[in-house]
Amino acid sequence: MVLLGLLQSGGWVLGQAMEQVTGGNLLSTLLIACAFTLSLVYLFRLAVGHMVQLPAGAKSPPHIYSPIPFLGHAIAFGKSPIEFLENAYEKYGPVFSFTMVGKTFTYLLGSDAAALLFNSKNEDLNAEEVYGRLTTPVFGKGVAYDVPNAIFLEQKKIIKSGLNIAHFKQYVPIIEKEAKEYFQSWGESGERNVFEALSELIILTASHCLHGKEIRSQLNEKVAQLYADLDGGFTHAAWLLPAWLPLPSFRRRDRAHREIKNIFYKAIQKRRLSKEPAEDILQTLLDSTYKDGRPLTDEEISGMLIGLLLAGQHTSSTTSAWMGFFLAKDKPLQEKCYLEQKAVCGEDLPPLTYDQLKDLNLLDRCIKETLRLRPPIMTMMRMAKTPQTVAGYTIPPGHQVCVSPTVNQRLKDSWAERLDFNPDRYLQDNPASGEKFAYVPFGAGRHRCVGENFAYVQIKTIWSTMLRLYEFDLINGYFPTVNYTTMIHTPENPVIRYKRRSK
Protein backbone atom coordinates (compact mmCIF):
# COMPACT_ATOMS: atom_id res chain seq x y z
CA MET A 1 0.00 0.00 0.00
CA VAL A 2 1.97 2.93 -1.24
CA LEU A 3 0.77 5.85 0.75
CA LEU A 4 1.24 9.28 -0.75
CA GLY A 5 1.51 11.45 -3.83
CA LEU A 6 3.14 14.62 -4.93
CA LEU A 7 2.51 18.25 -4.02
CA GLN A 8 0.85 19.59 -7.13
CA SER A 9 0.17 23.27 -6.78
CA GLY A 10 2.20 25.26 -4.30
CA GLY A 11 0.63 28.69 -4.18
CA TRP A 12 -2.90 27.63 -5.07
CA VAL A 13 -2.99 24.81 -2.58
CA LEU A 14 -1.65 26.97 0.23
CA GLY A 15 -4.22 29.66 -0.50
CA GLN A 16 -7.03 27.13 -0.40
CA ALA A 17 -5.67 25.58 2.78
CA MET A 18 -5.30 28.95 4.50
CA GLU A 19 -8.83 29.95 3.59
CA GLN A 20 -10.22 26.66 4.92
CA VAL A 21 -8.26 26.39 8.15
CA THR A 22 -8.41 30.02 9.24
CA GLY A 23 -12.01 30.76 8.39
CA GLY A 24 -10.86 34.24 7.43
CA ASN A 25 -9.26 34.92 10.83
CA LEU A 26 -6.60 37.58 10.23
CA LEU A 27 -4.22 36.51 13.01
CA SER A 28 -4.32 32.88 11.95
CA THR A 29 -3.79 33.87 8.35
CA LEU A 30 -0.77 36.01 9.26
CA LEU A 31 0.74 33.22 11.36
CA ILE A 32 0.38 30.75 8.53
CA ALA A 33 1.70 33.23 5.99
CA CYS A 34 4.77 33.87 8.17
CA ALA A 35 5.34 30.18 8.65
CA PHE A 36 4.94 29.59 4.94
CA THR A 37 7.44 32.34 4.16
CA LEU A 38 9.96 30.79 6.54
CA SER A 39 9.34 27.44 4.90
CA LEU A 40 9.98 28.94 1.47
CA VAL A 41 13.25 30.42 2.69
CA TYR A 42 14.22 27.03 4.07
CA LEU A 43 13.34 25.26 0.84
CA PHE A 44 15.26 27.84 -1.17
CA ARG A 45 18.37 27.37 0.95
CA LEU A 46 17.94 23.64 0.67
CA ALA A 47 17.68 23.87 -3.09
CA VAL A 48 20.78 26.04 -3.31
CA GLY A 49 22.63 23.66 -1.02
CA HIS A 50 21.86 20.81 -3.36
CA MET A 51 23.45 22.49 -6.36
CA VAL A 52 26.43 20.31 -7.19
CA GLN A 53 28.78 20.05 -10.09
CA LEU A 54 28.04 17.13 -12.37
CA PRO A 55 30.87 14.75 -13.29
CA ALA A 56 32.91 15.79 -16.32
CA GLY A 57 31.09 14.96 -19.54
CA ALA A 58 27.78 14.31 -17.79
CA LYS A 59 24.61 15.71 -19.33
CA SER A 60 21.69 16.99 -17.25
CA PRO A 61 18.12 15.94 -18.10
CA PRO A 62 16.19 18.39 -20.30
CA HIS A 63 14.86 21.16 -18.06
CA ILE A 64 11.44 22.69 -18.77
CA TYR A 65 11.90 26.43 -18.45
CA SER A 66 9.52 28.56 -16.38
CA PRO A 67 9.63 32.37 -16.13
CA ILE A 68 7.96 32.25 -12.69
CA PRO A 69 10.54 32.37 -9.88
CA PHE A 70 10.37 29.71 -7.19
CA LEU A 71 6.84 28.46 -7.93
CA GLY A 72 7.94 27.41 -11.39
CA HIS A 73 5.42 25.04 -12.96
CA ALA A 74 3.45 24.42 -9.76
CA ILE A 75 0.23 26.03 -10.98
CA ALA A 76 0.27 24.47 -14.47
CA PHE A 77 1.12 21.09 -12.99
CA GLY A 78 -1.51 21.44 -10.28
CA LYS A 79 -4.30 22.21 -12.74
CA SER A 80 -3.68 19.22 -15.00
CA PRO A 81 -0.75 17.05 -13.90
CA ILE A 82 -1.33 14.16 -16.28
CA GLU A 83 -1.64 16.41 -19.32
CA PHE A 84 1.47 18.30 -18.20
CA LEU A 85 3.53 15.10 -17.92
CA GLU A 86 2.23 13.57 -21.14
CA ASN A 87 3.01 16.74 -23.09
CA ALA A 88 6.49 16.84 -21.57
CA TYR A 89 7.03 13.20 -22.52
CA GLU A 90 6.08 13.94 -26.13
CA LYS A 91 8.41 16.95 -26.29
CA TYR A 92 11.40 15.89 -24.18
CA GLY A 93 11.30 12.11 -23.99
CA PRO A 94 11.20 9.77 -20.98
CA VAL A 95 13.46 11.86 -18.69
CA PHE A 96 12.99 15.56 -17.94
CA SER A 97 13.13 18.04 -15.06
CA PHE A 98 11.16 21.06 -13.92
CA THR A 99 10.90 23.28 -10.85
CA MET A 100 8.03 23.63 -8.38
CA VAL A 101 8.09 25.54 -5.08
CA GLY A 102 11.87 25.76 -5.09
CA LYS A 103 12.50 22.07 -5.75
CA THR A 104 13.59 20.33 -8.91
CA PHE A 105 11.59 17.28 -9.93
CA THR A 106 12.97 14.80 -12.45
CA TYR A 107 10.39 12.43 -13.92
CA LEU A 108 11.20 9.00 -15.30
CA LEU A 109 8.40 7.96 -17.65
CA GLY A 110 8.07 4.59 -19.33
CA SER A 111 9.21 1.20 -18.12
CA ASP A 112 12.89 1.54 -19.03
CA ALA A 113 13.41 4.91 -17.34
CA ALA A 114 11.33 3.94 -14.29
CA ALA A 115 13.65 1.00 -13.66
CA LEU A 116 16.17 3.43 -12.16
CA LEU A 117 13.84 4.31 -9.28
CA PHE A 118 12.42 0.86 -8.62
CA ASN A 119 15.79 -0.90 -8.77
CA SER A 120 17.64 1.72 -6.73
CA LYS A 121 19.22 1.35 -3.31
CA ASN A 122 17.88 3.55 -0.54
CA GLU A 123 21.26 5.21 -0.01
CA ASP A 124 21.11 6.43 -3.64
CA LEU A 125 17.43 7.32 -3.97
CA ASN A 126 16.00 7.95 -0.53
CA ALA A 127 12.32 7.66 0.43
CA GLU A 128 12.50 8.82 4.05
CA GLU A 129 13.42 12.40 3.14
CA VAL A 130 10.36 12.62 0.91
CA TYR A 131 7.68 10.92 2.99
CA GLY A 132 8.90 11.08 6.59
CA ARG A 133 7.43 14.50 7.39
CA LEU A 134 4.00 13.27 6.26
CA THR A 135 3.87 9.82 7.81
CA THR A 136 5.60 10.32 11.17
CA PRO A 137 2.97 12.67 12.69
CA VAL A 138 0.25 10.23 11.57
CA PHE A 139 1.82 6.82 12.28
CA GLY A 140 4.10 7.87 15.12
CA LYS A 141 7.77 7.50 15.92
CA GLY A 142 9.71 4.30 15.35
CA VAL A 143 7.91 2.99 12.27
CA ALA A 144 7.84 3.36 8.50
CA TYR A 145 9.83 6.36 7.25
CA ASP A 146 10.87 7.42 10.76
CA VAL A 147 13.40 4.56 11.05
CA PRO A 148 16.46 3.48 9.06
CA ASN A 149 15.47 1.69 5.89
CA ALA A 150 16.80 -1.66 7.12
CA ILE A 151 14.42 -1.53 10.10
CA PHE A 152 11.51 -0.47 7.89
CA LEU A 153 12.16 -3.44 5.61
CA GLU A 154 12.09 -5.74 8.63
CA GLN A 155 8.77 -4.23 9.71
CA LYS A 156 7.33 -4.77 6.23
CA LYS A 157 8.53 -8.37 6.25
CA ILE A 158 6.80 -8.97 9.59
CA ILE A 159 3.54 -7.52 8.29
CA LYS A 160 3.77 -9.51 5.08
CA SER A 161 4.19 -12.73 7.06
CA GLY A 162 0.78 -12.08 8.63
CA LEU A 163 -0.92 -11.36 5.32
CA ASN A 164 -0.96 -14.99 4.23
CA ILE A 165 -3.43 -17.35 2.59
CA ALA A 166 -4.38 -19.03 5.87
CA HIS A 167 -5.46 -15.66 7.24
CA PHE A 168 -7.15 -14.64 3.98
CA LYS A 169 -9.37 -17.72 4.18
CA GLN A 170 -10.62 -16.49 7.54
CA TYR A 171 -10.96 -12.90 6.38
CA VAL A 172 -13.36 -13.55 3.46
CA PRO A 173 -16.39 -14.50 5.62
CA ILE A 174 -15.58 -11.64 8.02
CA ILE A 175 -15.55 -9.09 5.19
CA GLU A 176 -18.70 -10.54 3.61
CA LYS A 177 -20.58 -10.39 6.92
CA GLU A 178 -19.50 -6.79 7.54
CA ALA A 179 -20.57 -5.83 4.00
CA LYS A 180 -24.00 -7.45 4.27
CA GLU A 181 -24.66 -5.72 7.57
CA TYR A 182 -23.49 -2.38 6.19
CA PHE A 183 -25.74 -2.52 3.12
CA GLN A 184 -28.85 -3.32 5.15
CA SER A 185 -29.36 0.42 5.56
CA TRP A 186 -29.38 1.04 1.80
CA GLY A 187 -32.90 -0.25 1.23
CA GLU A 188 -34.30 -1.24 -2.16
CA SER A 189 -32.97 1.61 -4.28
CA GLY A 190 -31.46 5.04 -4.09
CA GLU A 191 -28.44 7.22 -4.77
CA ARG A 192 -25.29 7.20 -2.65
CA ASN A 193 -21.86 8.73 -2.45
CA VAL A 194 -20.15 5.45 -3.18
CA PHE A 195 -16.68 6.68 -2.23
CA GLU A 196 -17.80 7.75 1.24
CA ALA A 197 -19.74 4.52 1.73
CA LEU A 198 -16.88 2.29 0.65
CA SER A 199 -14.40 4.27 2.74
CA GLU A 200 -16.53 3.56 5.81
CA LEU A 201 -16.96 -0.11 4.95
CA ILE A 202 -13.28 -0.63 4.23
CA ILE A 203 -12.32 0.88 7.59
CA LEU A 204 -14.73 -1.55 9.29
CA THR A 205 -13.51 -4.62 7.42
CA ALA A 206 -9.82 -3.75 7.66
CA SER A 207 -10.07 -3.04 11.37
CA HIS A 208 -11.86 -6.35 12.00
CA CYS A 209 -9.41 -8.42 9.95
CA LEU A 210 -6.15 -6.69 10.78
CA HIS A 211 -6.65 -5.18 14.22
CA GLY A 212 -8.80 -7.88 15.75
CA LYS A 213 -12.15 -7.98 17.50
CA GLU A 214 -10.98 -5.95 20.52
CA ILE A 215 -10.28 -2.87 18.42
CA ARG A 216 -13.13 -3.46 15.95
CA SER A 217 -15.63 -3.55 18.83
CA GLN A 218 -14.66 0.02 19.74
CA LEU A 219 -15.12 1.38 16.22
CA ASN A 220 -18.05 3.72 16.83
CA GLU A 221 -18.80 7.14 15.36
CA LYS A 222 -16.36 8.87 17.71
CA VAL A 223 -13.47 6.57 16.78
CA ALA A 224 -14.39 6.84 13.10
CA GLN A 225 -14.05 10.61 13.44
CA LEU A 226 -10.64 10.15 15.06
CA TYR A 227 -9.55 8.11 12.05
CA ALA A 228 -10.86 10.86 9.77
CA ASP A 229 -8.93 13.51 11.72
CA LEU A 230 -5.80 11.39 11.60
CA ASP A 231 -6.26 10.82 7.89
CA GLY A 232 -6.56 14.59 7.56
CA GLY A 233 -2.82 14.71 8.21
CA PHE A 234 -2.21 13.50 4.66
CA THR A 235 -2.49 16.85 2.93
CA HIS A 236 -0.44 19.07 0.66
CA ALA A 237 -0.05 21.51 3.56
CA ALA A 238 1.42 18.75 5.73
CA TRP A 239 3.89 17.93 2.98
CA LEU A 240 4.94 21.56 2.62
CA LEU A 241 4.72 23.07 6.11
CA PRO A 242 6.51 22.17 9.37
CA ALA A 243 4.59 19.64 11.50
CA TRP A 244 4.78 21.86 14.59
CA LEU A 245 2.67 24.69 13.15
CA PRO A 246 -0.55 25.22 15.18
CA LEU A 247 -2.91 24.68 12.25
CA PRO A 248 -6.35 23.32 13.19
CA SER A 249 -5.92 20.28 10.94
CA PHE A 250 -2.52 19.56 12.51
CA ARG A 251 -3.95 19.86 16.02
CA ARG A 252 -6.82 17.51 15.14
CA ARG A 253 -4.34 15.07 13.64
CA ASP A 254 -2.12 15.11 16.73
CA ARG A 255 -5.04 14.75 19.15
CA ALA A 256 -6.47 11.86 17.12
CA HIS A 257 -3.07 10.19 17.06
CA ARG A 258 -2.84 10.28 20.85
CA GLU A 259 -6.37 9.00 21.41
CA ILE A 260 -6.12 6.17 18.88
CA LYS A 261 -2.77 5.14 20.30
CA ASN A 262 -4.36 4.91 23.76
CA ILE A 263 -7.12 2.67 22.38
CA PHE A 264 -4.50 0.45 20.77
CA TYR A 265 -2.35 0.33 23.91
CA LYS A 266 -5.29 -0.99 25.93
CA ALA A 267 -6.12 -3.58 23.25
CA ILE A 268 -2.47 -4.68 23.10
CA GLN A 269 -2.31 -5.13 26.87
CA LYS A 270 -5.59 -7.04 26.88
CA ARG A 271 -4.33 -9.33 24.11
CA ARG A 272 -1.05 -9.96 25.93
CA LEU A 273 -3.01 -11.16 28.96
CA SER A 274 -5.46 -13.23 26.93
CA LYS A 275 -5.03 -16.98 26.51
CA GLU A 276 -7.35 -17.16 23.50
CA PRO A 277 -5.65 -17.80 20.13
CA ALA A 278 -6.14 -15.07 17.53
CA GLU A 279 -5.50 -14.95 13.80
CA ASP A 280 -4.91 -11.32 12.90
CA ILE A 281 -2.08 -8.90 12.27
CA LEU A 282 -2.15 -7.70 15.87
CA GLN A 283 -1.23 -11.20 17.00
CA THR A 284 1.42 -11.47 14.30
CA LEU A 285 3.05 -8.28 15.56
CA LEU A 286 2.90 -9.42 19.18
CA ASP A 287 4.54 -12.74 18.32
CA SER A 288 7.26 -11.33 16.05
CA THR A 289 10.80 -10.16 16.72
CA TYR A 290 13.44 -8.28 14.77
CA LYS A 291 16.48 -10.12 13.44
CA ASP A 292 18.40 -9.30 16.60
CA GLY A 293 15.71 -10.95 18.72
CA ARG A 294 14.15 -7.74 20.02
CA PRO A 295 10.33 -7.83 20.28
CA LEU A 296 8.24 -5.00 18.91
CA THR A 297 7.28 -2.32 21.41
CA ASP A 298 3.68 -1.26 21.99
CA GLU A 299 4.55 2.06 20.31
CA GLU A 300 5.82 0.26 17.21
CA ILE A 301 2.86 -2.12 17.09
CA SER A 302 0.29 0.66 17.37
CA GLY A 303 2.08 2.74 14.72
CA MET A 304 2.18 -0.20 12.32
CA LEU A 305 -1.53 -0.87 12.92
CA ILE A 306 -2.36 2.75 12.12
CA GLY A 307 -0.22 2.64 8.99
CA LEU A 308 -1.81 -0.57 7.77
CA LEU A 309 -5.32 0.74 8.20
CA LEU A 310 -4.89 4.18 6.66
CA ALA A 311 -2.64 3.16 3.77
CA GLY A 312 -4.92 0.29 2.83
CA GLN A 313 -8.05 2.37 3.25
CA HIS A 314 -6.85 4.86 0.66
CA THR A 315 -6.00 2.28 -1.97
CA SER A 316 -9.03 0.07 -1.48
CA SER A 317 -11.71 2.76 -1.13
CA THR A 318 -10.49 4.75 -4.12
CA THR A 319 -10.14 1.68 -6.34
CA SER A 320 -13.50 0.25 -5.24
CA ALA A 321 -15.31 3.51 -5.93
CA TRP A 322 -13.77 3.98 -9.37
CA MET A 323 -14.57 0.39 -10.33
CA GLY A 324 -18.20 1.01 -9.41
CA PHE A 325 -18.39 3.80 -11.96
CA PHE A 326 -16.67 1.78 -14.68
CA LEU A 327 -19.15 -1.08 -14.13
CA ALA A 328 -22.11 1.31 -13.99
CA LYS A 329 -21.00 2.82 -17.29
CA ASP A 330 -20.68 -0.60 -18.97
CA LYS A 331 -23.86 -2.45 -18.01
CA PRO A 332 -23.13 -5.56 -20.14
CA LEU A 333 -19.78 -5.93 -18.35
CA GLN A 334 -21.53 -5.47 -14.99
CA GLU A 335 -23.96 -8.26 -15.90
CA LYS A 336 -21.07 -10.53 -16.90
CA CYS A 337 -19.51 -9.95 -13.49
CA TYR A 338 -22.81 -10.87 -11.82
CA LEU A 339 -23.17 -14.03 -13.91
CA GLU A 340 -19.58 -14.95 -13.04
CA GLN A 341 -20.66 -15.01 -9.40
CA LYS A 342 -23.24 -17.68 -10.22
CA ALA A 343 -20.95 -19.64 -12.51
CA VAL A 344 -18.12 -19.81 -9.98
CA CYS A 345 -19.97 -19.87 -6.66
CA GLY A 346 -23.25 -21.57 -7.53
CA GLU A 347 -26.63 -20.52 -8.85
CA ASP A 348 -27.98 -19.88 -5.35
CA LEU A 349 -24.98 -17.66 -4.50
CA PRO A 350 -23.86 -19.30 -1.25
CA PRO A 351 -21.47 -17.54 1.17
CA LEU A 352 -18.15 -16.68 -0.40
CA THR A 353 -14.97 -18.63 0.18
CA TYR A 354 -11.38 -17.69 -0.54
CA ASP A 355 -11.01 -20.47 -3.13
CA GLN A 356 -14.06 -19.19 -5.01
CA LEU A 357 -12.75 -15.66 -4.81
CA LYS A 358 -9.54 -16.74 -6.55
CA ASP A 359 -11.57 -18.07 -9.50
CA LEU A 360 -13.47 -14.82 -10.10
CA ASN A 361 -11.14 -13.98 -12.97
CA LEU A 362 -13.28 -11.35 -14.69
CA LEU A 363 -13.75 -9.43 -11.45
CA ASP A 364 -10.02 -9.70 -10.87
CA ARG A 365 -9.32 -8.20 -14.29
CA CYS A 366 -11.80 -5.38 -13.63
CA ILE A 367 -9.87 -4.44 -10.50
CA LYS A 368 -6.61 -4.63 -12.42
CA GLU A 369 -7.93 -2.39 -15.19
CA THR A 370 -9.33 0.09 -12.66
CA LEU A 371 -5.90 0.29 -11.05
CA ARG A 372 -4.39 0.91 -14.48
CA LEU A 373 -6.60 3.86 -15.37
CA ARG A 374 -7.13 5.22 -11.84
CA PRO A 375 -4.17 4.31 -9.64
CA PRO A 376 -4.63 5.92 -6.21
CA ILE A 377 -1.16 7.46 -6.26
CA MET A 378 -0.17 9.59 -9.23
CA THR A 379 3.50 9.95 -8.33
CA MET A 380 6.07 7.96 -6.37
CA MET A 381 9.12 9.94 -5.27
CA ARG A 382 12.64 9.55 -3.96
CA MET A 383 15.34 12.08 -3.05
CA ALA A 384 18.52 11.68 -5.09
CA LYS A 385 21.48 11.36 -2.71
CA THR A 386 24.10 10.45 -5.33
CA PRO A 387 24.39 11.21 -9.07
CA GLN A 388 22.15 8.84 -11.04
CA THR A 389 22.50 8.04 -14.73
CA VAL A 390 19.53 7.10 -16.92
CA ALA A 391 18.87 7.31 -20.67
CA GLY A 392 22.17 9.13 -21.19
CA TYR A 393 21.42 11.82 -18.58
CA THR A 394 22.85 12.31 -15.10
CA ILE A 395 20.49 13.36 -12.30
CA PRO A 396 22.35 15.32 -9.59
CA PRO A 397 21.84 14.90 -5.84
CA GLY A 398 19.00 17.02 -4.49
CA HIS A 399 16.53 16.29 -7.27
CA GLN A 400 13.18 14.72 -6.40
CA VAL A 401 13.17 11.67 -8.66
CA CYS A 402 9.64 10.65 -9.67
CA VAL A 403 7.73 7.90 -11.44
CA SER A 404 4.06 8.34 -12.34
CA PRO A 405 2.04 5.09 -12.40
CA THR A 406 -0.84 7.02 -13.97
CA VAL A 407 1.26 8.10 -16.95
CA ASN A 408 3.19 4.84 -17.32
CA GLN A 409 -0.06 2.91 -17.38
CA ARG A 410 -1.52 4.90 -20.29
CA LEU A 411 1.50 5.70 -22.47
CA LYS A 412 0.76 5.61 -26.20
CA ASP A 413 4.02 3.76 -26.76
CA SER A 414 2.95 0.87 -24.52
CA TRP A 415 -0.82 0.49 -24.35
CA ALA A 416 -3.23 -0.12 -27.23
CA GLU A 417 -6.52 1.80 -26.87
CA ARG A 418 -4.91 3.20 -23.77
CA LEU A 419 -7.89 5.20 -22.44
CA ASP A 420 -10.46 2.41 -22.87
CA PHE A 421 -11.59 0.37 -19.88
CA ASN A 422 -10.97 -3.12 -21.22
CA PRO A 423 -10.43 -5.87 -18.63
CA ASP A 424 -9.94 -8.44 -21.38
CA ARG A 425 -6.68 -6.80 -22.46
CA TYR A 426 -5.02 -8.96 -19.78
CA LEU A 427 -6.05 -12.15 -21.60
CA GLN A 428 -3.51 -11.37 -24.33
CA ASP A 429 0.08 -10.20 -24.31
CA ASN A 430 0.19 -6.72 -22.84
CA PRO A 431 2.69 -4.31 -21.30
CA ALA A 432 1.73 -5.47 -17.80
CA SER A 433 3.37 -8.81 -18.56
CA GLY A 434 6.00 -7.73 -21.07
CA GLU A 435 7.38 -4.47 -19.65
CA LYS A 436 8.47 -4.74 -16.04
CA PHE A 437 7.49 -1.25 -14.93
CA ALA A 438 4.68 -0.37 -17.34
CA TYR A 439 2.11 -1.41 -14.73
CA VAL A 440 3.00 -0.33 -11.19
CA PRO A 441 -0.13 0.68 -9.20
CA PHE A 442 1.36 -0.87 -6.05
CA GLY A 443 4.90 0.23 -6.75
CA ALA A 444 7.80 -2.15 -7.29
CA GLY A 445 11.14 -3.05 -5.82
CA ARG A 446 11.92 -2.72 -2.12
CA HIS A 447 9.06 -0.26 -1.55
CA ARG A 448 6.35 -2.37 -3.19
CA CYS A 449 3.13 -2.36 -1.20
CA VAL A 450 2.99 -5.37 1.14
CA GLY A 451 -0.80 -5.18 1.34
CA GLU A 452 -1.49 -5.77 -2.36
CA ASN A 453 -2.89 -9.28 -1.92
CA PHE A 454 -5.06 -8.25 1.02
CA ALA A 455 -6.39 -5.32 -1.02
CA TYR A 456 -7.49 -7.72 -3.77
CA VAL A 457 -9.19 -10.01 -1.24
CA GLN A 458 -10.96 -7.07 0.38
CA ILE A 459 -12.11 -5.41 -2.85
CA LYS A 460 -13.20 -8.67 -4.49
CA THR A 461 -15.20 -9.73 -1.44
CA ILE A 462 -16.92 -6.36 -1.08
CA TRP A 463 -17.74 -6.06 -4.77
CA SER A 464 -18.92 -9.67 -4.94
CA THR A 465 -21.39 -8.79 -2.18
CA MET A 466 -22.44 -5.58 -3.93
CA LEU A 467 -22.98 -7.30 -7.29
CA ARG A 468 -25.10 -9.97 -5.66
CA LEU A 469 -27.28 -7.36 -3.95
CA TYR A 470 -27.60 -4.51 -6.45
CA GLU A 471 -27.49 -3.24 -10.00
CA PHE A 472 -25.63 0.04 -10.46
CA ASP A 473 -26.21 2.89 -12.91
CA LEU A 474 -24.73 6.28 -13.66
CA ILE A 475 -26.96 9.24 -12.80
CA ASN A 476 -27.89 11.00 -16.04
CA GLY A 477 -24.75 9.57 -17.62
CA TYR A 478 -22.44 11.37 -15.17
CA PHE A 479 -18.98 9.78 -14.89
CA PRO A 480 -16.72 11.51 -12.33
CA THR A 481 -13.64 13.48 -13.19
CA VAL A 482 -10.47 13.01 -11.15
CA ASN A 483 -9.95 15.24 -8.13
CA TYR A 484 -6.28 16.19 -8.48
CA THR A 485 -6.31 18.58 -5.51
CA THR A 486 -6.16 15.67 -3.05
CA MET A 487 -3.10 13.50 -2.49
CA ILE A 488 -5.14 10.38 -3.24
CA HIS A 489 -6.88 10.85 -6.58
CA THR A 490 -10.52 10.37 -5.74
CA PRO A 491 -13.59 10.76 -7.98
CA GLU A 492 -15.34 14.15 -8.01
CA ASN A 493 -18.94 14.05 -6.73
CA PRO A 494 -19.01 10.22 -6.68
CA VAL A 495 -22.76 9.65 -6.39
CA ILE A 496 -24.11 6.48 -8.01
CA ARG A 497 -27.60 5.00 -8.45
CA TYR A 498 -28.44 1.50 -7.25
CA LYS A 499 -31.41 -0.88 -7.29
CA ARG A 500 -31.76 -4.18 -5.45
CA ARG A 501 -31.69 -7.21 -7.71
CA SER A 502 -34.86 -9.24 -7.94
CA LYS A 503 -34.60 -12.67 -6.38
From Swiss-Prot:
Superkingdom to which the source organism belongs: Eukaryota
An MF annotation (GO) of this entry: iron ion binding
Known catalytic reactions: a 14alpha-methyl steroid + 3 reduced [NADPH--hemoprotein reductase] + 3 O2 = a Delta(14) steroid + formate + 3 oxidized [NADPH--hemoprotein reductase] + 4 H2O + 4 H(+); lanosterol + 3 reduced [NADPH--hemoprotein reductase] + 3 O2 = 4,4-dimethyl-5alpha-cholesta-8,14,24-trien-3beta-ol + formate + 3 oxidized [NADPH--hemoprotein reductase] + 4 H2O + 4 H(+); 24,25-dihydrolanosterol + 3 reduced [NADPH--hemoprotein reductase] + 3 O2 = 4,4-dimethyl-8,14-cholestadien-3beta-ol + formate + 3 oxidized [NADPH--hemoprotein reductase] + 4 H2O + 4 H(+); a 14alpha-methyl steroid + reduced [NADPH--hemoprotein reductase] + O2 = a 14alpha-hydroxymethyl steroid + oxidized [NADPH--hemoprotein reductase] + H2O + H(+)
A GO-annotated cellular component: endoplasmic reticulum membrane
Processing after translation: Ubiquitinated by MARCHF6, leading to proteasomal degradation.
Species of origin: Mus musculus (Mouse)
Sequence intervals crossing the membrane: 24-44
Cofactor: heme
Annotated protein name in UniProt: Lanosterol 14-alpha demethylase
Pathway noted in the entry: Steroid biosynthesis; zymosterol biosynthesis; zymosterol from lanosterol: step 1/6
Pfam families: p450
Loss of function: phenotype: Embryonic lethality at 15 dpc, likely due to heart failure. Mutant mice present complete block of de novo cholesterol synthesis at 14.5 dpc. Heart abnormalities include hypoplasia combined with ventricle septum and epicardial and vasculogenesis defects. Skeletal abnormalities include facial hypoplasia, brachycephaly, and bowed and jointed bones of the extremities with camptodactyly. Can serve as an animal model for studying Antley-Bixler syndrome.
Protein task: Sterol 14alpha-demethylase that plays a critical role in the cholesterol biosynthesis pathway, being cholesterol the major sterol component in mammalian membranes as well as a precursor for bile acid and steroid hormone synthesis.
PANTHER family tied to this protein: 24-HYDROXYCHOLESTEROL 7-ALPHA-HYDROXYLASE, CYTOCHROME P450 FAMILY 7
PROSITE patterns reported in the protein's UniProt record: CYTOCHROME_P450
Similarity field: Belongs to the cytochrome P450 family.
Localization (cell): Endoplasmic reticulum membrane; Microsome membrane
Description of how activity is regulated: Inhibited by azalanstat. Inhibited by azole antifungal agents ketoconazole, itraconazole and fluconazole.
E.C. no: 1.14.14.154
The entry's keywords: Cholesterol biosynthesis, Cholesterol metabolism, Endoplasmic reticulum, Heme, Iron, Lipid biosynthesis, Lipid metabolism, Membrane, Metal-binding, Microsome, Monooxygenase, Oxidoreductase, Steroid biosynthesis, Steroid metabolism, Sterol biosynthesis, Sterol metabolism, Transmembrane, Transmembrane helix, Ubl conjugation
GO biological process: cholesterol biosynthetic process; cholesterol biosynthetic process via 24,25-dihydrolanosterol; negative regulation of amyloid-beta clearance; negative regulation of protein catabolic process; negative regulation of protein secretion; positive regulation of oocyte development; response to human chorionic gonadotropin; response to insulin
Binding-site list for heme: C449
Disulfide pattern: none
